[in-house]
Amino acid sequence: MQFPDRLIQHFDSALRVMSGVSVAGRPNPAAKVADGDLDSAQRRHSAGLMRVNHVGEVCAQALYQAQAQFARSPAIRQQLLLAGREEEDHLAWTAERLRELGSRPSLLNPLWYAGAFALGTVAATLGDARSLGFVVETERQVEAHLNQHLSSLPPQDAKSLAIVKQMSTDEAEHGAAAHALGAQTVPPLAQMGMQAMAKVMTSTAYYL
């Protein structure tokens, strides 16, 4: 696919993400799970966590699109696009769960998307190995915060738990795939910067 075609594909993806019309390619893992009895505080907490997870998937779409756009290797570009497609499943699942909880996505999604796309572009310009290293570190941090959510979500919120469990499994697989393609380890200082930015995003998106 030529660069102009990839650019058009990116704009199409961005519009779908921003408009909330993403469609999952796989069944929702919570589709056949009974909804638990949540009180108002538990419902608000679950919604806050799932909003954070939805923002994470908005950022994932931007990151993978940017990195795929500027990847040098066709094989690496295809892997990034494949991972991005699976992340779009997560986007659809978390959006659906937010609706079920009577809540909404983050009001700052355009800002999160733009920032993540810029970050992905910078990572891609450093070369494929470093870009893949960025994927590995991103997925490691995302998997860690998803596992924290598994402990923080109300035990009776079986639907959210089912979604987060599948997301965690997928993130680990994406990180392993990037590592197998020759990822270069992200320097410790960059890892700390990524963690700091993620903390700002998660603490803000929980409410907004």
UniProtKB/Swiss-Prot annotation:
Q: What is its main location?
A: membrane
| Keyword presence, Lyase | no
Give the cofactor note text. Answer: Binds 2 iron ions per subunit.
Task: Please tell me which top-level EC class this enzyme sits in.
Answer: oxidoreductase
Localization, per the record, is:
Cell membrane
A molecular function annotated in GO for this UniProt entry is: metal ion binding
Give the protein's cofactors. Fe cation
Give binding positions for Fe cation 1: 57, 87, 90, 171
A biological process (GO) of this protein is:
ubiquinone biosynthetic process
Q: How does it sit in the membrane?
A: Peripheral membrane protein
Annotated keywords: Cell membrane, Iron, Membrane, Metal-binding, Monooxygenase, Oxidoreductase, Ubiquinone biosynthesis
The pathway to which it is assigned is: Cofactor biosynthesis; ubiquinone biosynthesis
Identify the residues that bind Fe cation 2. Answer: 87, 139, 171, 174
According to UniProt, the reaction catalysed is: a 5-methoxy-2-methyl-3-(all-trans-polyprenyl)benzene-1,4-diol + AH2 + O2 = a 3-demethylubiquinol + A + H2O
Coiled-coil stretches noted in the UniProt entry, renumbered to this chain: none
Its GO CC terms are: plasma membrane
- For this protein, what is the EC number? 1.14.99.60
Q: Does the keyword Transferase apply?
A: no
Gene3D superfamilies assigned to the protein according to its UniProt record, in alphabetical order: 1.20.1260.10
- Name the family the entry cites: Belongs to the COQ7 family.
* PANTHER family in the cross-refs: 5-DEMETHOXYUBIQUINONE HYDROXYLASE, MITOCHONDRIAL, COENZYME Q10 BIOSYNTHESIS PROTEIN 7
Q: What does this protein do?
A: Catalyzes the hydroxylation of 2-nonaprenyl-3-methyl-6-methoxy-1,4-benzoquinol during ubiquinone biosynthesis.
Full protein name: 3-demethoxyubiquinol 3-hydroxylase
Source species: Janthinobacterium sp. (strain Marseille)
Which lineage do the record's taxonomy fields give for this organism? Bacteria, Pseudomonadati, Pseudomonadota, Betaproteobacteria, Burkholderiales
